[in-house]
């Protein structure tokens, strides 16, 4: 009989999704049970008892708030939520729709807009709101209105990258190198204070060198109401029109990241070939902005921040000390603006040399603006003035040609006054084009052409001439191209990059790279990977440096891969066999052996590497032994530290000034957040890095890997944070024992079937009363109080001070 009664209750619960009210025939139950069952909450979909609840809120299936306190009030025969004005502002309504909703007794009156529907999902504790799409100011799942963005909490942070290496040649001096770089900062409200630092120490038998310090300090804050960002202090001049340089001053600029994805900027892709376990360092004006360890073979770096613009210096340092330097152009895509809108950049200050806090004795002012004149046409221009010695003006047009792609063309005029010469005036012409070819799925990421007169000087070039004339180069012509082409039937991907630069007073240079990779299946061998790459660098009046690379990789065993690769350059040929294996999602290792034609003993060498990813950071170690030549070992560690009033934690490294999310689980440790990469520490704190600014981000608790006896009431967080934010979210969590109880009141009666059991101090629901007072409580602690609620009645149960044998059923009086 009990089984049938439980089945009946299950059917009642399953009936909740019905759109209309349901009347239940209780005559099928025993007469003694009819008065002890509370099913009032099961009659209609979304019905909830009057009172205050902490719930999630979603608009058209997009979650806009977590842990929102809402009061449900009785109105006639219905229970409706009281929505305050601050929550309505997060809906993202158009201004005229928002203004049409009056406020009555601190609750917004929606009676004039009956098309807005409210439904409470009791199972997920979420208020679902349906709003006609035409009433919303936004339509994209990847973008939310500024009214929903969060600035985060106050705190301090430290992002760090640590590198150590030792090189011991067969003959000559051994050397040890230690270096570090990163960012330290403080958040207060929407303000962010940041200091970039880099340190380097090199020791050898005949040389000891130590350098570094704080490369720049600046203060910034996003201004969502203006769609812009204010920056004060030591920073870099970033422009879509003028060349970049370092300066100390102030800047106010529109931030593309506050726009939908299709209107955001472009970041360059950098590719090359490493001959050993090499370190790739990318810097701009002497400041390191990116550093990464790469294995032998072709590498692609495509995760640079899109705010990086101008010429980037790339240094590939091989583990045996050899260095390969080249440059890439990080030009912007066509400067397009939506119709009727204006984007702008204002900057003023004093220029400063690279890696210096001292400024030059001159002041500049710059402004640029882009206006969306028509739906697909933008006009843009700018001015840059420095005292009486330098003046520059630019004007251009950007055109979205739809299926033909997007292009821009601009002309820049500049007048430069040098102390020992007459004024020099000239023009510079620039053309940009980008296109996604849907028919062939080809991508022309950037095609750019620029030509400058002999007497044209950008402001950055003018400063070089004035303060460092011996090294100043006058640009004549630049051509850059980046193309991608997948060939789906062959599982083949082709990439090509080209940069050609000529100078009025220096040798021309050309750098080109072509990479092809595809996967094939041969018989029982699946997922065979084959890739080849050609890289060439040529400086006028110098020999061309060509590099060819071929790699074949086959799966072997459980997660392992065996490979062969060959590198041929103008000076040597390398053959290498390798084995790489992934132990689990946190650990991987590899080893290789090979020959190199231009080294002693034919360059016979063996290498090994190991990588470990933890919640606190990423560790990498590698080593090489080359017969009769050298031995080397290197190690790196990258991570971050974040502290707020709610706690502190070491965690995986955050990226530049992107937000990070601190999650608190009420002191419960080892709760997996965001897959299995981030776990709460001993104090119940975890920090999730790599959150995107101004983009709705979802972070979820892995409910399948919770520790025994742990319960998390809310397992999904979806919020949007502004740049540099330290987000914070507390997830109600319990760690304890699972207890089977029988609840009865002083008269021996049981609470009604379906009565809700809530934790007394937090109000979190921990269970529901079953037949004859039975209930299952999970993750509870000794001596805890719980409130049993049905309708407008309630009583309190108290767990014993000691729970020794949880296999036995406890009888708890409810007072």
Curated annotation (Swiss-Prot):
What name goes with this protein? Uncharacterized outer membrane usher protein YbgQ
Which GO BP annotation is one of this protein's? Answer: pilus assembly
- Tell me how this protein sits in the membrane: Multi-pass membrane protein
Q: Which of UniProt's keywords are assigned here?
A: Cell outer membrane, Disulfide bond, Fimbrium biogenesis, Membrane, Signal, Transmembrane, Transmembrane beta strand, Transport
Instruction: Tell me which InterPro entries the record gives.
Output: Fimb_usher, Fimbrial_membr_usher_CS, FimD_plug_dom, PapC-like_C, PapC-like_C_sf, PapC_N, PapC_N_sf
The domain of life is Bacteria
What GO MF annotations does this protein's record show?
A: fimbrial usher porin activity
State its role: Could be involved in the export and assembly of the putative YbgD fimbrial subunit across the outer membrane.
For this record, the Gene Ontology CC terms, alphabetical, are: cell outer membrane
- The region annotated as signal peptide is 1-21
Cystine pairings recorded for this chain: 795-814
Family per similarity comment: Belongs to the fimbrial export usher family.
Statement: the UniProt record of this protein carries the keyword Transport: yes
List where in the cell it is found: Cell outer membrane
What species was this sequence derived from?
A: Escherichia coli (strain K12)
């Amino acid at each position: 009989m009990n089984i049938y009664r439980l089945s009946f209750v299950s059917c009642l619960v399953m009936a909740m999704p019905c759109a209309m009210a349901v009347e239940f025939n209780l005559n099928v139950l025993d007469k003694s049970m009819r008065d002890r069952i509370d099913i009032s909450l099961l009659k209609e979909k979304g019905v909830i008892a009057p009172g205050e609840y902490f719930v999630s809120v979603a608009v058209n299936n997009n979650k806009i708030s977590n842990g929102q306190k809402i009061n449900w009030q009785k109105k006639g025969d219905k229970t409706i939520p009281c929505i305050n004005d601050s929550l309505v502002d997060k809906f993202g309504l158009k201004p005229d729709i928002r203004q049409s909703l009056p406020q009555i007794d601190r609750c917004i009156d929606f009676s004039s807009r009956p098309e807005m529907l409210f439904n409470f999902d009791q199972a997920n504790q979420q208020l679902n709101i349906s709003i006609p799409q035409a009433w919303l100011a936004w339509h994209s799942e990847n973008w939310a209105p500024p009214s929903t963005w969060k600035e985060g909490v106050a705190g301090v942070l430290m992002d760090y990258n640590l590198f150590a290496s030792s090189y011991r040649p067969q003959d000559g001096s051994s050397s040890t190198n230690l270096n570090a770089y990163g960012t330290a900062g403080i958040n207060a409200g929407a303000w962010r204070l940041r200091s970039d630092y880099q340190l380097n120490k090199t020791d050898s038998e005949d040389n000891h060198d130590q350098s570094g310090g704080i490369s720049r300090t600046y203060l910034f804050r996003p201004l969502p109401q203006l769609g812009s960002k204010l920056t004060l202090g030591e920073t870099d001049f970033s422009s879509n029109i003028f060349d970049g340089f370092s300066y100390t001053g102030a800047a106010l600029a529109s931030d593309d990241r506050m726009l939908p994805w299709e209107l955001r900027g472009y970041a360059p892709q950098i590719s090359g070939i490493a001959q050993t376990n090499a370190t790739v360092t990318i810097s701009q004006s002497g400041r390191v902005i990116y550093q990464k360890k790469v294995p032998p073979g072709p590498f692609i770096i495509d995760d640079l921040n899109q705010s990086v613009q101008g010429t980037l210096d790339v240094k590939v340092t091989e583990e045996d000390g050899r260095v390969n330097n080249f440059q890439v152009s990080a030009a912007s895509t066509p400067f397009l603006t939506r119709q009727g809108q204006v984007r702008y950049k204002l900057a003023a200050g004093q220029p400063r040399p690279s890696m210096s806090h001292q400024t030059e004795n001159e002041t500049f002012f710059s402004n640029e603006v882009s206006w969306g004149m028509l739906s697909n046409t933008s006009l843009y221009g700018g001015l840059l003035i420095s005292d009486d010695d330098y003046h520059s003006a630019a004007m251009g047009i950007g055109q979205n040609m739809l299926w033909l792609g997007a292009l821009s063309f601009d002309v820049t005029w500049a007048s430069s006054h040098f102390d020992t010469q007459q004024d020099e005036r000239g023009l510079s012409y620039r053309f940009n084009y980008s296109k996604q070819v849907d028919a062939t799925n080809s991508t022309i990421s950037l095609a750019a052409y620029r030509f400058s007169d002999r007497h044209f000087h950008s402001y950055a070039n003018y400063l070089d001439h004035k303060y460092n004339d011996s090294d100043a180069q006058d640009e004549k012509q630049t051509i850059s191209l980046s193309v991608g082409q997948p060939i789906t039937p062959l599982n083949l991907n082709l990439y090509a990059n080209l940069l050609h630069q000529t100078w009025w007073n220096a040798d021309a240079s050309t750098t080109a790279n072509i990479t092809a990779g595809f996967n094939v299946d041969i018989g029982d061998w699946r997922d065979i990977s084959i890739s080849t790459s050609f890289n060439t660098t040529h400086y006028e009046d110098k020999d061309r440096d060509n590099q060819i690379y071929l790699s074949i990789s086959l799966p072997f065993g459980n997660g392992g891969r065996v490979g062969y690769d060959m590198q041929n350059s103008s000076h040597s040929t390398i053959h290498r066999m390798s084995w790489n294996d992934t132990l689990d999602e946190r650990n991987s290792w590899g080893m290789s052996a090979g020959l190199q034609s231009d080294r002693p003993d034919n360059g016979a060498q063996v290498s090994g590497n190991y990588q470990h990813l933890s919640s606190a950071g990423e560790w990498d170690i590698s080593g090489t032994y080359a017969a009769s030549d050298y031995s080397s070992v290197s190690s790196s560690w990258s991570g971050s530290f974040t502290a707020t009033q709610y706690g502190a934690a070491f965690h995986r490294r955050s990226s530049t000034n992107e937000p990070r999310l601190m999650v608190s689980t009420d002191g419960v440790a080892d709760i997996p957040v965001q897959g299995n990469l981030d776990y709460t520490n001993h104090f119940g704190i975890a920090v999730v890095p790599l959150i995107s600014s101004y983009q709705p981000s979802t972070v979820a608790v892995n409910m399948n890997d919770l520790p025994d006896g742990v319960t998390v009431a809310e397992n999904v967080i979806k919020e949007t944070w502004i740049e540099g934010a330290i987000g914070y979210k507390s997830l109600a969590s319990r760690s304890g024992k699972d207890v089977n109880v029988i609840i009865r009141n002083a008269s021996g009666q049981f609470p009604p079937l379906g009565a809700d059991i809530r934790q007394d101090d937090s109000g979190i629901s921990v269970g529901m009363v079953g037949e004859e007072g039975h209930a299952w409580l999970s993750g509870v602690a000794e001596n805890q109080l719980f409130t049993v609620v049905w309708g407008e009645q309630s009583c309190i149960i108290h767990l014993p001070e000691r729970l020794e044998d949880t296999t036995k059923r406890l009888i708890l009086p409810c007072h």
